[in-house]
Amino acid sequence: MASLFSISSSPFFFSSVKPHFSQRKRPTLHLTVPFTVKSLLSPATDTPSPAVQTFWQWLCDKGVVSANSPVVKPGIVPEGLGLIAQRDMSRNEVVLEVPKKFWINPDTVASSEIGKLCGGLKPWVSVALFLLREKSNKDSLWRSYLEILPEQTNSTIYWSEEELSELQGTQLLNTTLGVKEYVQSEFLKIKEEIILPNKHLFPSITMDDFIWAFGILRSRAFSRLRGQNLVLIPLADLINHNSSITTEDNAWEIKGGGLFSRDVLFSLRTPVSVKSGEQVYIQYDLGKSNAELALDYGFVESRSDRNAYTLTLEISESDPFFGDKLDIAESNGLVGETAYFDIVLGHSLPPALLPYLRLVALGGTDAFLLESIFRNSVWGHLELPVSRANEELICRVVRNACRTALSGYKTTIEEDEKLLEGGNLDPRLEIAVGVRAGEKRVLEQIDEIFKNRELELDELEYYQERRLKDLGLVGEQGDIIFWEPK
Protein backbone atom coordinates (compact mmCIF):
# COMPACT_ATOMS: atom_id res chain seq x y z
CA MET A 1 0.00 0.00 0.00
CA ALA A 2 2.82 2.38 0.83
CA SER A 3 3.94 2.31 -2.79
CA LEU A 4 0.76 4.17 -3.72
CA PHE A 5 1.91 7.26 -1.83
CA SER A 6 5.06 9.28 -2.36
CA ILE A 7 6.31 12.70 -1.36
CA SER A 8 8.42 14.39 -3.97
CA SER A 9 8.49 17.27 -6.42
CA SER A 10 8.79 17.30 -10.15
CA PRO A 11 10.79 19.82 -12.18
CA PHE A 12 8.83 22.82 -13.38
CA PHE A 13 9.82 24.73 -16.46
CA PHE A 14 8.35 27.34 -18.76
CA SER A 15 4.67 27.34 -19.58
CA SER A 16 5.27 25.02 -22.53
CA VAL A 17 6.03 22.26 -20.02
CA LYS A 18 3.28 21.31 -17.59
CA PRO A 19 4.39 22.57 -14.15
CA HIS A 20 4.12 20.00 -11.39
CA PHE A 21 5.54 21.89 -8.44
CA SER A 22 2.55 24.01 -7.60
CA GLN A 23 -1.20 23.90 -7.99
CA ARG A 24 -1.56 27.50 -6.87
CA LYS A 25 -1.97 30.32 -9.35
CA ARG A 26 0.83 30.00 -11.86
CA PRO A 27 3.26 32.89 -12.26
CA THR A 28 2.46 35.24 -15.11
CA LEU A 29 5.63 37.27 -14.87
CA HIS A 30 9.33 36.59 -14.54
CA LEU A 31 11.58 39.47 -13.64
CA THR A 32 15.05 40.47 -12.55
CA VAL A 33 16.80 38.74 -9.69
CA PRO A 34 17.53 40.55 -6.45
CA PHE A 35 20.05 38.81 -4.20
CA THR A 36 18.19 39.95 -1.08
CA VAL A 37 14.91 41.62 -0.28
CA LYS A 38 15.28 45.11 1.15
CA SER A 39 12.94 47.79 2.44
CA LEU A 40 10.77 49.94 0.23
CA LEU A 41 13.02 52.92 0.88
CA SER A 42 16.23 51.36 -0.44
CA PRO A 43 18.19 54.21 -2.07
CA ALA A 44 20.77 54.16 -4.84
CA THR A 45 24.20 53.68 -3.30
CA ASP A 46 26.70 54.32 -6.08
CA THR A 47 27.28 55.82 -9.50
CA PRO A 48 26.23 53.46 -12.31
CA SER A 49 29.01 51.62 -14.12
CA PRO A 50 30.13 52.68 -17.61
CA ALA A 51 28.10 49.78 -19.05
CA VAL A 52 24.93 51.05 -17.36
CA GLN A 53 25.62 54.60 -18.52
CA THR A 54 26.10 53.33 -22.08
CA PHE A 55 22.83 51.41 -21.83
CA TRP A 56 21.03 54.54 -20.61
CA GLN A 57 22.46 56.59 -23.46
CA TRP A 58 21.28 53.94 -25.92
CA LEU A 59 17.75 54.17 -24.49
CA CYS A 60 17.86 57.97 -24.80
CA ASP A 61 19.19 57.86 -28.37
CA LYS A 62 16.44 55.44 -29.39
CA GLY A 63 13.74 57.60 -27.80
CA VAL A 64 12.69 54.95 -25.29
CA VAL A 65 13.19 57.43 -22.45
CA SER A 66 13.49 61.18 -22.14
CA ALA A 67 17.04 62.31 -21.42
CA ASN A 68 15.82 65.63 -20.00
CA SER A 69 13.02 64.50 -17.70
CA PRO A 70 13.21 60.77 -17.00
CA VAL A 71 10.82 59.31 -14.45
CA VAL A 72 13.31 56.61 -13.41
CA LYS A 73 16.93 55.79 -14.11
CA PRO A 74 18.98 52.62 -13.57
CA GLY A 75 21.02 52.70 -10.38
CA ILE A 76 23.21 50.57 -8.14
CA VAL A 77 21.09 49.18 -5.31
CA PRO A 78 21.51 46.39 -2.72
CA GLU A 79 19.89 43.94 -5.16
CA GLY A 80 22.37 44.82 -7.93
CA LEU A 81 20.70 47.08 -10.48
CA GLY A 82 17.31 48.70 -9.95
CA LEU A 83 15.07 51.54 -11.06
CA ILE A 84 15.53 54.78 -9.09
CA ALA A 85 12.77 57.39 -9.01
CA GLN A 86 13.89 60.77 -10.34
CA ARG A 87 10.88 62.52 -8.79
CA ASP A 88 8.05 61.77 -6.39
CA MET A 89 5.50 59.36 -7.83
CA SER A 90 1.96 58.50 -6.82
CA ARG A 91 0.49 55.02 -6.57
CA ASN A 92 -0.30 53.52 -10.03
CA GLU A 93 1.69 56.22 -11.81
CA VAL A 94 3.42 55.13 -15.03
CA VAL A 95 7.11 54.43 -14.43
CA LEU A 96 8.15 53.70 -18.01
CA GLU A 97 6.81 52.62 -21.39
CA VAL A 98 8.81 50.53 -23.84
CA PRO A 99 7.72 50.22 -27.51
CA LYS A 100 7.38 46.73 -28.96
CA LYS A 101 10.29 47.20 -31.37
CA PHE A 102 12.60 47.19 -28.34
CA TRP A 103 11.29 43.89 -26.97
CA ILE A 104 13.18 40.63 -27.45
CA ASN A 105 10.78 37.78 -28.14
CA PRO A 106 10.30 34.91 -30.62
CA ASP A 107 9.19 37.44 -33.25
CA THR A 108 12.54 39.21 -32.84
CA VAL A 109 14.28 35.89 -33.42
CA ALA A 110 12.10 35.06 -36.43
CA SER A 111 13.08 38.29 -38.18
CA SER A 112 16.79 37.81 -37.45
CA GLU A 113 19.45 36.00 -39.44
CA ILE A 114 18.86 32.78 -37.49
CA GLY A 115 15.07 33.00 -37.73
CA LYS A 116 14.63 30.22 -40.30
CA LEU A 117 16.68 27.84 -38.17
CA CYS A 118 14.63 28.51 -35.03
CA GLY A 119 11.13 28.16 -36.45
CA GLY A 120 10.34 24.81 -34.84
CA LEU A 121 12.03 25.41 -31.51
CA LYS A 122 10.44 26.07 -28.14
CA PRO A 123 10.10 29.86 -27.67
CA TRP A 124 12.61 30.02 -24.82
CA VAL A 125 15.17 27.94 -26.73
CA SER A 126 15.00 30.21 -29.77
CA VAL A 127 15.34 33.35 -27.64
CA ALA A 128 18.23 31.79 -25.69
CA LEU A 129 20.08 31.09 -28.94
CA PHE A 130 19.40 34.63 -30.09
CA LEU A 131 20.80 36.09 -26.87
CA LEU A 132 23.99 34.04 -27.11
CA ARG A 133 24.52 34.94 -30.75
CA GLU A 134 23.93 38.64 -30.15
CA LYS A 135 26.15 38.58 -27.06
CA SER A 136 29.08 37.44 -29.19
CA ASN A 137 28.41 40.07 -31.88
CA LYS A 138 30.23 43.33 -31.13
CA ASP A 139 28.01 45.17 -33.60
CA SER A 140 24.72 43.86 -32.20
CA LEU A 141 21.85 46.32 -31.89
CA TRP A 142 21.28 44.84 -28.43
CA ARG A 143 24.85 45.01 -27.21
CA SER A 144 24.29 47.87 -24.74
CA TYR A 145 21.49 45.88 -23.11
CA LEU A 146 23.35 42.58 -23.09
CA GLU A 147 26.38 44.20 -21.46
CA ILE A 148 24.41 44.98 -18.27
CA LEU A 149 23.03 41.48 -17.80
CA PRO A 150 24.60 39.60 -14.86
CA GLU A 151 26.92 36.67 -15.51
CA GLN A 152 24.91 34.71 -12.96
CA THR A 153 22.51 35.18 -10.08
CA ASN A 154 21.88 33.33 -6.84
CA SER A 155 19.35 31.09 -8.59
CA THR A 156 20.04 27.48 -7.61
CA ILE A 157 20.70 26.56 -11.24
CA TYR A 158 24.05 28.38 -10.91
CA TRP A 159 25.13 26.75 -7.65
CA SER A 160 28.23 24.56 -7.34
CA GLU A 161 27.99 20.95 -6.15
CA GLU A 162 29.23 22.04 -2.73
CA GLU A 163 26.54 24.72 -2.51
CA LEU A 164 23.86 22.30 -3.70
CA SER A 165 24.89 19.85 -0.97
CA GLU A 166 23.35 22.30 1.53
CA LEU A 167 19.99 21.47 -0.07
CA GLN A 168 20.29 17.77 0.75
CA GLY A 169 16.87 16.23 1.31
CA THR A 170 14.92 19.18 -0.12
CA GLN A 171 12.46 19.13 -2.96
CA LEU A 172 14.28 22.19 -4.30
CA LEU A 173 17.40 20.09 -4.88
CA ASN A 174 15.43 17.54 -6.91
CA THR A 175 13.75 20.31 -8.85
CA THR A 176 17.03 22.13 -9.55
CA LEU A 177 18.73 18.97 -10.80
CA GLY A 178 15.68 18.17 -12.91
CA VAL A 179 15.68 21.63 -14.47
CA LYS A 180 19.40 21.43 -15.25
CA GLU A 181 18.92 18.00 -16.80
CA TYR A 182 16.07 19.36 -18.90
CA VAL A 183 18.15 22.34 -20.08
CA GLN A 184 21.07 20.04 -20.89
CA SER A 185 18.85 17.76 -22.99
CA GLU A 186 17.56 20.77 -24.94
CA PHE A 187 21.12 22.02 -25.43
CA LEU A 188 22.43 18.69 -26.72
CA LYS A 189 19.53 18.52 -29.16
CA ILE A 190 20.03 21.99 -30.67
CA LYS A 191 23.80 21.62 -30.61
CA GLU A 192 23.52 18.58 -32.85
CA GLU A 193 20.70 19.86 -35.05
CA ILE A 194 21.38 23.61 -35.31
CA ILE A 195 24.61 24.92 -33.79
CA LEU A 196 27.20 22.51 -35.26
CA PRO A 197 25.71 22.44 -38.80
CA ASN A 198 25.69 26.27 -38.81
CA LYS A 199 29.03 27.22 -37.27
CA HIS A 200 29.19 30.30 -39.49
CA LEU A 201 26.14 31.71 -37.68
CA PHE A 202 26.85 30.70 -34.10
CA PRO A 203 29.74 31.28 -31.72
CA SER A 204 31.20 28.41 -29.74
CA ILE A 205 28.30 27.81 -27.33
CA THR A 206 28.85 25.70 -24.21
CA MET A 207 26.42 24.16 -21.76
CA ASP A 208 27.36 26.88 -19.25
CA ASP A 209 26.47 29.52 -21.84
CA PHE A 210 23.10 27.90 -22.42
CA ILE A 211 22.41 27.68 -18.67
CA TRP A 212 23.24 31.38 -18.45
CA ALA A 213 20.70 32.22 -21.15
CA PHE A 214 18.08 29.99 -19.53
CA GLY A 215 18.62 31.68 -16.17
CA ILE A 216 18.36 35.14 -17.72
CA LEU A 217 15.04 34.25 -19.32
CA ARG A 218 13.67 32.52 -16.25
CA SER A 219 14.45 35.50 -14.04
CA ARG A 220 13.85 38.44 -16.36
CA ALA A 221 11.35 37.48 -19.05
CA PHE A 222 7.76 38.68 -18.93
CA SER A 223 5.53 35.81 -20.00
CA ARG A 224 1.84 35.44 -20.85
CA LEU A 225 1.36 39.08 -21.59
CA ARG A 226 -1.48 39.71 -24.01
CA GLY A 227 -0.57 37.90 -27.23
CA GLN A 228 2.96 37.27 -26.01
CA ASN A 229 4.52 34.00 -24.89
CA LEU A 230 7.94 35.14 -23.72
CA VAL A 231 9.35 38.67 -23.76
CA LEU A 232 12.51 40.39 -22.55
CA ILE A 233 11.91 44.10 -22.11
CA PRO A 234 15.08 46.17 -21.62
CA LEU A 235 14.93 48.66 -18.72
CA ALA A 236 11.59 47.29 -17.49
CA ASP A 237 13.35 44.11 -16.40
CA LEU A 238 15.43 46.09 -13.90
CA ILE A 239 12.39 46.41 -11.64
CA ASN A 240 13.02 44.58 -8.37
CA HIS A 241 10.77 42.70 -5.97
CA ASN A 242 9.77 43.74 -2.48
CA SER A 243 7.87 41.55 -0.05
CA SER A 244 6.22 44.60 1.52
CA ILE A 245 4.14 45.04 -1.63
CA THR A 246 1.18 42.70 -1.32
CA THR A 247 -0.60 43.26 -4.62
CA GLU A 248 0.21 42.25 -8.18
CA ASP A 249 -2.67 44.21 -9.68
CA ASN A 250 -2.11 46.85 -12.36
CA ALA A 251 1.70 46.81 -12.19
CA TRP A 252 1.98 46.41 -15.96
CA GLU A 253 -0.09 46.28 -19.11
CA ILE A 254 0.16 46.18 -22.89
CA LYS A 255 -1.48 49.14 -24.56
CA GLY A 256 -1.60 51.16 -27.76
CA GLY A 257 0.70 54.12 -28.29
CA GLY A 258 -2.08 56.62 -28.86
CA LEU A 259 -4.93 57.62 -31.16
CA PHE A 260 -2.80 58.01 -34.30
CA SER A 261 -0.08 55.53 -33.42
CA ARG A 262 0.24 51.87 -34.31
CA ASP A 263 2.86 51.33 -31.62
CA VAL A 264 2.25 48.75 -28.93
CA LEU A 265 3.77 49.66 -25.57
CA PHE A 266 4.69 47.79 -22.42
CA SER A 267 3.63 50.07 -19.59
CA LEU A 268 4.98 49.63 -16.05
CA ARG A 269 3.34 51.31 -13.03
CA THR A 270 4.38 51.69 -9.42
CA PRO A 271 1.98 49.91 -7.03
CA VAL A 272 2.88 52.27 -4.17
CA SER A 273 3.86 55.92 -3.77
CA VAL A 274 7.60 56.53 -4.16
CA LYS A 275 9.80 59.48 -3.17
CA SER A 276 12.50 60.88 -5.42
CA GLY A 277 15.73 58.92 -4.95
CA GLU A 278 13.99 55.78 -3.73
CA GLN A 279 13.92 52.51 -5.59
CA VAL A 280 10.72 51.51 -7.41
CA TYR A 281 9.52 47.99 -6.62
CA ILE A 282 6.74 45.58 -7.54
CA GLN A 283 5.52 42.24 -6.22
CA TYR A 284 6.79 39.42 -8.46
CA ASP A 285 4.29 36.74 -7.53
CA LEU A 286 2.32 36.21 -4.33
CA GLY A 287 1.73 32.56 -5.21
CA LYS A 288 5.33 31.41 -5.43
CA SER A 289 6.87 29.32 -2.68
CA ASN A 290 10.35 30.01 -1.34
CA ALA A 291 11.65 27.09 -3.39
CA GLU A 292 10.25 28.68 -6.56
CA LEU A 293 11.66 32.09 -5.62
CA ALA A 294 15.07 30.52 -5.02
CA LEU A 295 15.03 28.68 -8.33
CA ASP A 296 13.72 31.55 -10.43
CA TYR A 297 15.28 34.61 -8.82
CA GLY A 298 17.80 33.60 -6.17
CA PHE A 299 16.19 34.81 -2.94
CA VAL A 300 13.75 33.67 -0.25
CA GLU A 301 11.39 35.49 2.09
CA SER A 302 10.74 35.16 5.81
CA ARG A 303 6.94 35.06 5.36
CA SER A 304 5.66 31.72 6.66
CA ASP A 305 3.23 31.21 3.78
CA ARG A 306 6.15 31.16 1.33
CA ASN A 307 7.06 27.76 2.81
CA ALA A 308 5.39 24.89 0.98
CA TYR A 309 5.80 21.19 0.38
CA THR A 310 4.35 19.13 -2.44
CA LEU A 311 2.69 15.82 -1.72
CA THR A 312 2.78 13.58 -4.77
CA LEU A 313 0.11 10.88 -4.70
CA GLU A 314 -0.18 8.08 -7.20
CA ILE A 315 -2.76 5.50 -8.18
CA SER A 316 -0.65 2.41 -8.79
CA GLU A 317 -1.14 0.63 -12.11
CA SER A 318 -1.02 -2.64 -10.16
CA ASP A 319 -4.09 -1.61 -8.16
CA PRO A 320 -6.93 -4.01 -9.14
CA PHE A 321 -9.26 -1.00 -9.24
CA PHE A 322 -6.84 1.23 -11.19
CA GLY A 323 -9.26 2.03 -14.03
CA ASP A 324 -12.17 2.86 -11.75
CA LYS A 325 -10.07 5.05 -9.46
CA LEU A 326 -8.50 6.86 -12.40
CA ASP A 327 -11.93 7.55 -13.88
CA ILE A 328 -13.24 8.90 -10.57
CA ALA A 329 -10.18 11.12 -10.07
CA GLU A 330 -10.40 12.53 -13.59
CA SER A 331 -14.13 13.14 -13.21
CA ASN A 332 -13.26 15.38 -10.27
CA GLY A 333 -10.54 17.43 -11.91
CA LEU A 334 -7.48 15.32 -11.04
CA VAL A 335 -6.19 14.18 -14.41
CA GLY A 336 -3.80 11.23 -14.66
CA GLU A 337 -2.64 8.60 -12.20
CA THR A 338 -0.50 11.13 -10.30
CA ALA A 339 -1.80 14.13 -8.36
CA TYR A 340 0.14 16.98 -6.75
CA PHE A 341 -0.96 18.84 -3.63
CA ASP A 342 0.84 21.89 -2.26
CA ILE A 343 0.75 22.10 1.53
CA VAL A 344 1.47 25.64 2.76
CA LEU A 345 2.78 26.39 6.24
CA GLY A 346 0.02 27.66 8.49
CA HIS A 347 -2.72 26.81 5.97
CA SER A 348 -5.28 24.01 6.03
CA LEU A 349 -4.96 20.99 3.75
CA PRO A 350 -6.11 21.39 0.11
CA PRO A 351 -9.81 20.42 -0.09
CA ALA A 352 -9.25 17.58 -2.56
CA LEU A 353 -6.39 15.95 -0.63
CA LEU A 354 -8.33 13.81 1.85
CA PRO A 355 -10.89 12.58 -0.73
CA TYR A 356 -8.04 11.64 -3.08
CA LEU A 357 -6.14 9.85 -0.30
CA ARG A 358 -9.27 7.88 0.59
CA LEU A 359 -9.78 7.01 -3.08
CA VAL A 360 -6.22 5.74 -3.50
CA ALA A 361 -6.48 3.69 -0.30
CA LEU A 362 -9.92 2.30 -1.12
CA GLY A 363 -10.07 -1.51 -1.15
CA GLY A 364 -11.38 -4.59 0.64
CA THR A 365 -14.92 -4.25 1.93
CA ASP A 366 -14.95 -0.55 1.01
CA ALA A 367 -14.47 -1.27 -2.70
CA PHE A 368 -18.24 -1.36 -3.28
CA LEU A 369 -18.08 2.46 -3.51
CA LEU A 370 -16.23 2.01 -6.81
CA GLU A 371 -19.21 0.33 -8.45
CA SER A 372 -20.85 2.22 -11.29
CA ILE A 373 -24.04 2.82 -9.30
CA PHE A 374 -22.03 5.15 -7.01
CA ARG A 375 -20.08 6.86 -9.80
CA ASN A 376 -21.95 10.17 -9.62
CA SER A 377 -21.91 10.34 -5.82
CA VAL A 378 -18.67 8.62 -4.82
CA TRP A 379 -16.62 11.84 -4.47
CA GLY A 380 -19.17 13.18 -2.02
CA HIS A 381 -18.78 10.00 0.04
CA LEU A 382 -14.98 10.34 -0.11
CA GLU A 383 -15.16 13.85 1.32
CA LEU A 384 -16.08 12.18 4.62
CA PRO A 385 -14.39 9.22 6.35
CA VAL A 386 -15.20 5.95 4.58
CA SER A 387 -14.18 3.39 7.19
CA ARG A 388 -11.86 3.15 10.16
CA ALA A 389 -9.48 0.89 8.22
CA ASN A 390 -9.32 3.31 5.29
CA GLU A 391 -8.79 6.36 7.50
CA GLU A 392 -6.19 4.59 9.64
CA LEU A 393 -4.29 3.52 6.53
CA ILE A 394 -4.01 7.00 5.04
CA CYS A 395 -2.87 8.41 8.39
CA ARG A 396 -0.20 5.75 8.77
CA VAL A 397 1.13 6.04 5.23
CA VAL A 398 1.27 9.85 5.22
CA ARG A 399 2.98 9.96 8.62
CA ASN A 400 5.52 7.35 7.53
CA ALA A 401 6.22 9.35 4.37
CA CYS A 402 6.73 12.53 6.41
CA ARG A 403 9.14 10.80 8.78
CA THR A 404 11.08 9.36 5.85
CA ALA A 405 11.31 12.77 4.19
CA LEU A 406 12.45 14.43 7.44
CA SER A 407 15.20 11.84 7.85
CA GLY A 408 16.67 12.91 4.51
CA TYR A 409 17.82 16.33 5.74
CA LYS A 410 21.27 16.64 7.27
CA THR A 411 20.20 19.23 9.85
CA THR A 412 17.35 19.75 12.28
CA ILE A 413 15.01 22.73 12.32
CA GLU A 414 16.68 23.90 15.53
CA GLU A 415 20.12 23.83 13.89
CA ASP A 416 18.79 25.76 10.89
CA GLU A 417 17.14 28.37 13.09
CA LYS A 418 20.38 28.84 15.01
CA LEU A 419 22.25 29.46 11.75
CA LEU A 420 19.67 32.00 10.60
CA GLU A 421 19.67 33.78 13.95
CA GLY A 422 23.46 34.06 13.85
CA GLY A 423 23.33 36.09 10.64
CA ASN A 424 26.23 36.92 8.31
CA LEU A 425 25.55 33.87 6.15
CA ASP A 426 26.67 33.63 2.55
CA PRO A 427 23.59 34.55 0.44
CA ARG A 428 23.36 31.09 -1.09
CA LEU A 429 23.75 29.33 2.25
CA GLU A 430 21.05 31.60 3.66
CA ILE A 431 18.73 30.53 0.83
CA ALA A 432 19.52 26.85 1.43
CA VAL A 433 18.94 27.08 5.18
CA GLY A 434 15.72 29.04 4.69
CA VAL A 435 14.29 26.56 2.19
CA ARG A 436 15.20 23.40 4.09
CA ALA A 437 13.94 24.81 7.39
CA GLY A 438 10.67 25.81 5.72
CA GLU A 439 10.17 22.40 4.14
CA LYS A 440 10.77 20.66 7.47
CA ARG A 441 8.26 22.90 9.23
CA VAL A 442 5.63 21.98 6.65
CA LEU A 443 6.43 18.27 6.97
CA GLU A 444 6.07 18.51 10.75
CA GLN A 445 2.75 20.33 10.24
CA ILE A 446 1.47 17.55 7.96
CA ASP A 447 2.61 14.88 10.42
CA GLU A 448 0.88 16.69 13.29
CA ILE A 449 -2.39 16.94 11.33
CA PHE A 450 -2.49 13.21 10.64
CA LYS A 451 -1.27 12.35 14.15
CA ASN A 452 -4.25 14.23 15.58
CA ARG A 453 -6.50 12.48 13.07
CA GLU A 454 -5.26 9.10 14.28
CA LEU A 455 -6.29 10.06 17.82
CA GLU A 456 -9.82 10.81 16.56
CA LEU A 457 -10.37 7.54 14.67
CA ASP A 458 -12.72 6.10 17.30
CA GLU A 459 -14.80 9.27 17.33
CA LEU A 460 -15.25 9.73 13.58
CA GLU A 461 -18.46 8.84 11.80
CA TYR A 462 -17.93 6.48 8.86
CA TYR A 463 -19.95 5.66 5.75
CA GLN A 464 -21.91 2.73 7.18
CA GLU A 465 -23.03 4.77 10.20
CA ARG A 466 -24.09 7.65 7.98
CA ARG A 467 -25.96 5.27 5.72
CA LEU A 468 -27.86 3.69 8.61
CA LYS A 469 -28.81 7.14 9.89
CA ASP A 470 -30.10 8.09 6.46
CA LEU A 471 -32.27 4.97 6.53
CA GLY A 472 -33.53 5.78 10.02
CA LEU A 473 -31.94 2.65 11.47
CA VAL A 474 -29.92 4.34 14.23
CA GLY A 475 -31.52 5.37 17.51
CA GLU A 476 -30.99 8.51 19.53
CA GLN A 477 -28.21 6.81 21.55
CA GLY A 478 -26.46 5.62 18.40
CA ASP A 479 -27.76 2.06 18.75
CA ILE A 480 -28.82 0.16 15.63
CA ILE A 481 -32.59 -0.40 15.32
CA PHE A 482 -33.38 -3.82 13.83
CA TRP A 483 -37.17 -3.52 14.01
CA GLU A 484 -39.79 -1.12 15.25
CA PRO A 485 -41.66 -2.19 18.47
CA LYS A 486 -45.42 -2.67 18.16
Mark where each language-model region is.
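Residue-level recognition of conserved beta-strand edge/terminus positions
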Residues: 98-99, 105, 242, 283
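Conserved, structured regulatory domains from eukaryotic proteins
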Residues: 118-133, 141, 147-148
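Residue-level marker of beta-strand positions
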Residues: 94-97, 279
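Charged low-complexity "KEKE/polyampholyte" interaction tracts
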Residues: 2-80, 100-114, 136-141, 202-205, ...
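A short, structural micro-pattern
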Residues: 121-125, 233, 303-307
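Catalytic core of the SET domain in histone-lysine N-methyltransferases
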Residues: 43-82, 135-286, 322
